[in-house]
């Protein structure tokens, strides 16, 4: 699977682009659980929540009234699906996503790397009980004291 990276400045439509790409991937297969193989990473918790909300909102639109979604035409064309087939896939994917919400991986870059580090903790010689220190003040104080 390819790694797609999108970079853009504030207000340039990143959420729209990422939502479209997420939907394109999630609906590219008849497997309604395919969303669980997608990893979307962004910088802030606010952006993460906004992206999750937008993806669910658009999946709902595609599942209930596809003509109301700005992505409907583009997805039917790109995925080579009839509108009714796209709607069916959206219904099944939305249901699967809501029933297995913990597998809906849209996260911040720090939580992504925290998961990566945890998965290699044993190989790195650490216990799995690692925590991320966001406040740099205690870290600086500790460095000065040593």
Predicted features along the sequence, with ranges:
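P-loop NTPase Walker
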Residues: 1-123
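Gly/Lys-enriched N-terminal cap/neck module of very large, oligomeric protein machines
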Residues: 105, 122-137, 145
